[in-house]
Curated annotation (Swiss-Prot):
Belongs to the universal ribosomal protein uL1 family. Transmembrane segments: none annotated. It comes from Acidothermus cellulolyticus (strain ATCC 43068 / DSM 8971 / 11B). One of its GO terms (biological process) is regulation of translation. The keyword Electron transport does not apply. Keywords: Repressor, Ribonucleoprotein, Ribosomal protein, RNA-binding, rRNA-binding, Translation regulation, tRNA-binding. GO terms for cellular component: large ribosomal subunit. One of its GO terms (molecular function) is structural constituent of ribosome. This is Large ribosomal subunit protein uL1. Binds directly to 23S rRNA. The L1 stalk is quite mobile in the ribosome, and is involved in E site tRNA release. PROSITE patterns: RIBOSOMAL_L1.
Amino acid sequence: MKRGKKYRAAAQLVDRTKLYSPLEAMRLAKQTNTMRVPATVEVAMRLGVDPRKADQMVRGTVNLPHGTGKTPRVLVFATAERAEEARAAGADYVGADELIEQVANGFLDFDAVVATPDLMGKVGRLGRILGPRGLMPNPKTGTVTNDVAKAVADIKSGKIEFRVDRQANLHLVIGKTDFTEQQLVENYAAALDEVLRLKPPTAKGRYLKKVTISTTMGPGIPVDPNRVRNLLAEETAAA
């Protein structure tokens, strides 16, 4: 794949022979933004798990202290009082049968989905549409609940969901390039802590194998996966 001049210039700023501290990586991410507007900052983690095994599926949520820089659009499947509570909490789309039909017909203009337990029998038919996009409501992530107001508020304030893919990778948005370096590191730390907490007991060998920080259209920045404490320090380790 041929890269543009801006990308090549940004890539030259990254030393591929070293592992950066989280603070240095965030600083570099801001410097390597090739877009004219603030870009999304993402962290990719390669985990030492086998996602084919049910007991090694890493999935969870984390409340980022500084949010993602984007106000997510939340869709809620609910009726009656729960529907009103969802609207009052700021949900962007609220409904039941008609809304389920809209999604089944291709409506996907939202970033998160919440559902009340009584509607999951009907929402289940959307599994093939929502599942691959990581949008299917799940009790483990707090998105199947009767407390829809709290679920909506959590998502709007920076709660993100993550799930390991078939290649044992996790991808999480941790902010934008107009965040301060400290804000990005603190969001990264919150995500890292939760991923480490969810290490499956059956996982063998090194759990956190590789960490890369990147921006939209920007180069990957290798981060020292052994740095799990004192993340605001400057030191780096040799690759």
